[in-house]
């Protein structure tokens, strides 16, 4: 095998590894967001929290990026008369995104 082929395989492996880390970080971000939203809405039982997490995960499958999750959480806050605006939700998305990335990278070490 030539050094070019070895380098190509290494780059492909790194790309796959990075994609897996991104996927795990997005899933972790959504988990943090869902549980934060549960706290704000007042969802307390473990079963209800798990169901809400599943709803957030399903919402995230609609389109790339966190936009669909923001829309879902905002609608849920409005439905439960929670006075948290979209800007605050987006701030939480950014915070939890960074937290999730750090957690996933630390676990991968």
Residue ranges and their predicted role:
Residues 1-109:
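A charge-rich, low-complexity, intrinsically flexible signal that marks solvent-exposed coils, linkers
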């Amino acid at each position: 095998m030539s050094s070019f082929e070895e380098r190509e395989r290494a780059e492909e492996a790194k790309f796959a590894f990075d994609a897996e880390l991104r996927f795990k970080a997005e899933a972790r971000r959504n988990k943090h967001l869902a549980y934060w939203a549960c706290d704000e809405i007042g969802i307390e039982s473990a079963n209800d929290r798990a169901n809400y997490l599943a709803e957030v995960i399903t919402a995230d499958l609609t389109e790339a990026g966190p936009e669909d999750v923001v829309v879902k959480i905002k609608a849920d806050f409005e439905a439960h008369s929670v006075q948290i605006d979209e800007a605050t939700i987006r701030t939480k998305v950014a915070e939890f995104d960074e937290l999730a990335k750090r957690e996933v990278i630390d676990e991968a070490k």
